[in-house]
Amino acid sequence: MGARASVLSGGKLDAWEKIRLRPGGKKKYRLKHLVWASRELERFALNPGLLETSDGCKQIIGQLQPAIRTGSEELRSLFNTVATLYCVHERIEVKDTKEALEKMEEEQNKSKNKKAQQAAADAGNNSQVSQNYPIVQNLQGQMVHQAISPRTLNAWVKVIEEKAFSPEVIPMFSALSEGATPQDLNTMLNTVGGHQAAMQMLKETINEEAAEWDRLHPVHAGPIAPGQMREPRGSDIAGTTSTLQEQIAWMTSNPPIPVGEIYKRWIILGLNKIVRMYSPVSILDIRQGPKEPFRDYVDRFYKTLRAEQASQEVKGWMTETLLVQNANPDCKTILKALGPQATLEEMMTACQGVGGPSHKARVLAEAMSQATNSAAAVMMQRGNFKGPRKTIKCFNCGKEGHIAKNCRAPRRKGCWKCGKEGHQLKDCTERQANFLREDLAFPQGKAGELSSEQTRANSPTSRELRVWGRDNPLSETGAERQGTVSFNCPQITLWQRPLVTIKIGGQLKEALLDTGADDTVLEEMNLPGKWKPKMIGGIGGFIKVRQYDQILIEICGHKAIGTVLVGPTPVNIIGRNLLTQIGCTLNFPISPIETVPVKLKPGMDGPKVKQWPLTEEKIKALTEICTEMEKEGKISRVGPENPYNTPIFAIKKKDSTKWRKLVDFRELNKRTQDFWEVQLGIPHPAGLKKKKSVTVLDVGDAYFSVPLDKDFRKYTAFTIPSINNETPGIRYQYNVLPQGWKGSPAIFQSSMTKILEPFRKQNPEIVIYQYMDDLYVGSDLEIGQHRTKIEELREHLLRWGFTTPDKKHQKEPPFLWMGYELHPDKWTVQSIKLPEKESWTVNDIQKLVGKLNWASQIYPGIKVRQLCKLLRGTKALTEVIPLTEEAELELAENREILKEPVHGVYYDPSKDLIAEIQKQGHGQWTYQIYQEPFKNLKTGKYARMRGAHTNDVKQLAEVVQKISTESIVIWGKTPKFRLPIQKETWETWWVEYWQATWIPEWEFVNTPPLVKLWYQLEKEPIIGAETFYVDGAANRETKLGKAGYVTDRGRQKVVPFTDTTNQKTELQAINLALQDSGLEVNIVTDSQYALGIIQAQPDKSESELVSQIIEQLIKKEKVYLAWVPAHKGIGGNEQVDKLVSQGIRKVLFLDGIDKAQEEHEKYHNNWRAMASDFNLPPVVAKEIVASCDKCQLKGEAMHGQVDCSPGIWQLDCTHLEGKVILVAVHVASGYIEAEVIPAETGQETAYFILKLAGRWPVKIVHTDNGSNFTSAAVKAACWWAGIKQEFGIPYNPQSQGVVESMNKELKKIIGQVRDQAEHLKTAVQMAVFIHNFKRKGGIGGYSAGERIIDIIATDIQTKELQKQITKIQNFRVYYRDSRDPIWKGPAKLLWKGEGAVVIQDNSDIKVVPRRKVKIIRDYGKQMAGDDCVASRQDED
């Protein structure tokens, strides 16, 4: 924090600490606000160093100000802090933040006026648009664009990954895209193109805005004058139909057209929509995490509360109830003890350091030490005393310049108050916070090297001399405390001589701590008391000394009394006689890697899976392996107190007689917390820069070198069984990361990165690529120097317990790394041999496809489409599959390609990347990325069909998208593309179909076959061509259908089909029209499905029928396709509909429409009810609702989405027309009882509850804290009727807001029927009737009335069934899974039906067919092996 704290110094810091956060508030700015601000700036990709000057603050304000309106609270706080800091730098006197903002505004207004005057004078001189993406003037006077940097792109990708479209994304996007061109913005969007749903929303917004732009800026008639630029269209602004040069010209013309800013505004509009969709936060969702500090939780709670749409009273209730209710258990206990009237300040004080990670206690210690400091220090804090400021010193490591909160050193063990182990500060019973900085004895500035068994900040495996401080043995408590070890002690490393300052006889001397010396020997000095002569032997011979007994000596602040020898010694020595008294120990720490804390998923326990029987040879092999592992400390034995178990087994190693131990961690993996993978992919050799010297290392026993969290080890327990259960099994648990456990890769990678970090910093000229246990080390050093560095690296790794075996240490090329073969100036994949086989199984083909995919990185032209087709459907791995002719041909072609070895080259950052794409046919594409022709960096293929129907242009865009993403990952930039498509073809397509996956810079390359559009649909009807009205119909039950057409020239045709659907017949009808028409034709359909397929102009399809239509379309000269709504009485459409419906559609529903409309006018029932009651198609029923003006106020309310216990009702009062309506909702069904009550009193409410209980089974009523619900009358009524009353939040958080939404729904229905009733109470009962019986939807598609009856009846049946289930519990089930032939079990029988049973195996509930289970009675603890009861027992 040293750098961050240096933002202000001296008088400026005093001025800063006088400014109040709010006008009239108590809190003032402190140093911590500067630290926070500098951290926040890093998140916005801004340099924290800018805070040190007023100009820097101005620049920050300029970046943040545009985003303030849409920004989050954090952004606003950051802006306020920087504005206040600016005033301090400029020495503008301000009292609080508000005043600082006003002064800032005044300054900005002044500077705006100055700039306006200067702009006129400087026009033409300054062409720089932005700092971020400058469009600069080169030496020739041309405007040149500097492309967006990979660092900015990386920051943007990280923002999306971390924030996941939370509100902070918008200001961050705004800051990162300052001054960008549309092409830059498209590059940014391309990098996050994988978020398809979000990109789709963004695309729609951009489409709308572009259309609006085109509407407001119509094209001028006539040709453009020479030398004049054309005006940008909407698609030009979005960078789809404009070139980079055009964009630069628009942005730098006079007057400029800021296409970048306009496009950015459109994107921000789209991002706003996305944010609203992705971040719907309700106050009920705000809960304190198990390790979240209370202060952070309160911040989130109030931030959300401010946005909540509720009255002040409701917000008050939320603060009183929800804040405590949703705190974590630790904080909740403390808050409840404080009582109901506690202030927020008291709550935060009480919960400080509780509920957060252990390091939060450091903050509390810091605060306590400051609180106990002298009054002068307090005066200085307040700014009353201008004396010299005391330097900040860390409590954790003792260094100056930062506080414990920001300390990077590992946390010291033990309590921060008394120094003892076994508890933390919050649990300390010591009354005095004896934690003043002077108590820490850190001799000679070595305070940074603190004692900790687990971590070493500076010297991982150094021998260390540690002085364990005991309390003064002369004190009263000395006798009690003998042997108590305190961690408040120095640690002295042995890289240098351990010299310390000692105090003896009132004199200070320097002495050497010598654990090899028996006695303490000091140079000539006078000591009080009697002495005896003595001779002592040393390395230089014997010397005469004086022996003084019972001498008091102070070493590192710790006192000891013992014998001291005085004589002519070359150096003062403190020997073991005194070192043992002060608890000094010599330590040899090993494998000091910091353990990563790991937890199970909330609410889950460890695995308890039984060990299955193993053969004798496997047991012997496992016993040998585990004995060896135990000796090495990788595993340790556990006793019967550990209830957890994971099964193990053994397999033979490949081409060896040795055995390998495998642990089946599937169950533990399900229960372990999720981890963030540190690396998202593997490094690629094409991204390596060419290096003079290269070495490849492999870390031996990688996982077994990293310790596992002590508290988690018990869950990894496993058992080696004995033969024939002769003795109990031997049980072990892992002390290190186990193979096969889900946390091992992430923890190993994280540990390895931390270990390599200091080496990387010391040797920036060396490149280390790290993936799991494979290390690639490259440098431009001479080979001798390079190898010296490699040895340093190996030594560095060895200090941390990582070995790099010589066996896998590759010094000479070719290097085998990550499946690649690396040479000094080229690379390839390790040799690939395709197997020759007579017959191919599914497994063989899967392996073959995997090999070919791997080879396609560098071998251009590899295809696998036909081979993949063979694997379609669910097939057993051993099933033999005959190769089709196409697959055999494809395989033969691939063999030819692989015959000649192909190499790739390394990346040169000074040259441009170029990507060239070729079409291979059958939807397959190949591409090469290179910097020099015929020297490929890498190659690849693409054969994915994103939809059933597509065309080449669409697929080409997908290939480009894939290559762009791949290039950004490997090289941090996108290549220039060379595509086999004419510019005209491209523009024809994208004028209609532009979207959020834009093409970067590209040029046409004439590589056959070229991509083209095979046919085009007309925009307007073709005059003089015959018009075909087409339609199709099918019966769902019989699958019979008809397709046909009627033309405007009197022709008609109907063709019957079998085994068809409505959608197929619609397409068949179009196909018929195309077959029977001339070269020009107009076709009118009422099918949106058919229209959607054909308008996208596909040229290939998986559907045979669509392929036929495509063939017909290619033959035509002109085709116009139009859509009309069905059943609207449109001439030709109505005729053809009747023609194809005869004998197909069961009932002509037209008769029911009038009745349905009539009923809707009365009851305003929803479309589901009408579709069900009058046998109408959903589209017709929806049309009736759509045409009703009273039903268009809002969308329909969702019913029945909450599934709760049958006896829960929620009650609430709502107000309408000055009257009170009491509403009761049955939570599970959405059924309503409501009444207008004379007054909102307890008496009326109690009477209503009794009426409700008389009609329905009511077990629980959930209400708010209104006075009528908390009254004695209601309590008495509930007690009499046996109803439990709940307030606040019900236990099921899903059921929140049920009454609120029903109130709105009821008011909406009342509004629809109000004019039919004179009195409100009549309208209320009409609305209740409509809601309960005339609206269908939700669970089961019932009305609420039907649903409540169904739920109550089901509840009664379930209770009856429950009685029978207790009988079923006495049975055990053995069962087989779909493919696995081994019998599993025993499982618990939950339910037995005719065709299947429901069983519970461990915690999983499964449904298994009857034919795959054996049900037996539970005969106690007898083992059910393959040859005992389970196999022989008849089925029950």
Curated annotation (Swiss-Prot):
It catalyses: Specific for a P1 residue that is hydrophobic, and P1' variable, but often Pro; Endohydrolysis of RNA in RNA/DNA hybrids. Three different cleavage modes: 1. sequence-specific internal cleavage of RNA. Human immunodeficiency virus type 1 and Moloney murine leukemia virus enzymes prefer to cleave the RNA strand one nucleotide away from the RNA-DNA junction. 2. RNA 5'-end directed cleavage 13-19 nucleotides from the RNA end. 3. DNA 3'-end directed cleavage 15-20 nucleotides away from the primer terminus; 3'-end directed exonucleolytic cleavage of viral RNA-DNA hybrid; DNA(n) + a 2'-deoxyribonucleoside 5'-triphosphate = DNA(n+1) + diphosphate. This is Gag-Pol polyprotein. The modification Phosphotyrosine is found at residue 133. Zn(2+) binds at residues 1160, 1164, 1188, 1191. It comes from Human immunodeficiency virus type 1 group M subtype D (isolate Z2/CDC-Z34). The record marks 133-134, 364-365, 378-379, 434-435, 442-443, 489-490, 588-589, 1028-1029, 1148-1149 as: Cleavage. It holds the Pfam family RVP. The gene is gag-pol. GO terms for molecular function: aspartic-type endopeptidase activity; DNA binding; DNA-directed DNA polymerase activity; exoribonuclease H activity; lipid binding; RNA stem-loop binding; RNA-directed DNA polymerase activity; RNA-DNA hybrid ribonuclease activity. Its cofactor is Mg(2+). A lipid is attached at residue 2 (N-myristoyl glycine).
